[in-house]
Each structure stands twice: as C-alpha cells, then as structure tokens.
C-alpha cells in the first residue's frame, strides 16, 4: 500500500513514521519543500514531491487498476490546520480518481465532516475523519472505507483498540 501525505509538519512526520513501520509507503507533500525533503532525508517518509499533482500521480502508480484487480484505491491523508483542509481537498480533487479515499487527520467537527463527505461521495471519492490523541484513534466514515484503510489506523494506535464511528445515511 502507498499513501500520499499532505502536510508533513510535526503531526504528519510522527504519523508517517508509525505508518511506515507497517510497510506502507508514505509520500509527502507540504508547501515548504525543504521541510518535506528534510523528513525524507531522516527516513521519516518514503519520498517527497513538490506539488499535489505529482503526489497523486505517484500514489496512483500502483493503484490505477484497483477496481478490476482488487488493489487498494489511492489514499491521501491530510494533516493540515482546519482552515487549510478545504483548499487542499479542492486542489487534490483535480487529480483524484473515482474510488480514491481522503482521510482528514485533525480536529473533528461533525458538520464539516458531513459537508465534505456528502460533497466528495457525489464525485465517487470516499472521506474519512481520523482523530488521533496519544495512543487512541477515533474514525468516522463508511464501514467499507474504514476497512480498506484499517492497516493505516492500526499503525497509529498499535497497542490499543481503535474506535470506528460508521456514519449513517448517504455514506453507507
């Protein structure tokens, strides 16, 4: 599995280390390429790119055929300040394929989650909110999407159980 990480500040860098420990490739992008390059040189991400378009390209290299071969869809994790999430999603959407998954890791707001997930589901993109705190993870999204990404979530809380909150209505 390979994921694209958008926002590799302190939280993103720490998450990527845990995720990579479970043999998942993590490719990083942030507006400050020198910071992303530094994380790559430390071995905290598998690779780094200079823009979201190339990040999507790299993530899709191994997952283009997932719908017919059972491979994992393109998975993108956002570790951004709340005010930057919608802008990043809009930029990423220009390069997403139907079936891709966007995970927001940050402060959870149900109204924002609902709005984003409804908008994205109309475009064939799945949306998951993942709130991490210390060694616990709370996940909100469709059961199928959470299952596809379970190895990511388990890597974030390896010594404890993680809770999933499956949304009802349009997402199931």
Where are these regions (language model features)?
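Alpha-helix capping at helix-to-loop junctions
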Residues: 122, 151, 155-162
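Short beta-strand and adjoining strand-loop segment in the mid-core
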Residues: 23, 27, 76, 134-154
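Fold-independent oxyanion-binding glycine-rich loops
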Residues: 8, 31-32, 80, 105-107, ...
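Electropositive phosphate-/nucleotide-binding environments in soluble metabolic enzymes
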Residues: 9, 13, 30-33, 49, ...
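Conserved Rossmann-fold dehydrogenase catalytic segment
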Residues: 129-136, 158-172
């Amino acid at each position: 599995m390979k994921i694209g990480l958008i926002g590799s500040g302190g939280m993103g860098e720490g998450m990527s280390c845990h995720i990579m420990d479970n043999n998942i490739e993590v490719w990083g992008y942030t507006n400050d390429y020198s910071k992303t390059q530094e994380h790559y040189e430390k071995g905290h991400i598998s690779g780094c790119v200079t823009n979201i378009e190339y990040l999507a390209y790299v993530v899709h290299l191994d997952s283009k055929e997932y719908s017919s071969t059972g491979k994992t869809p393109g998975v993108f994790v956002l570790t951004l300040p709340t005010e930057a999430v919608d802008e990043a999603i809009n930029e990423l959407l220009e390069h997403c394929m139907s079936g891709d998954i966007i995970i927001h890791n940050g402060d959870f707001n149900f109204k924002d989650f609902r709005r984003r997930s409804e908008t994205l589901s109309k475009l064939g993109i799945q949306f998951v909110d993942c709130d991490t705190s210390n060694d616990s993870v709370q996940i909100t999204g469709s059961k199928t999407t959470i299952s596809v990404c379970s190895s990511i979530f388990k890597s974030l809380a390896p010594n404890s159980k993680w809770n999933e909150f499956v949304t009802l209505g349009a997402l199931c």
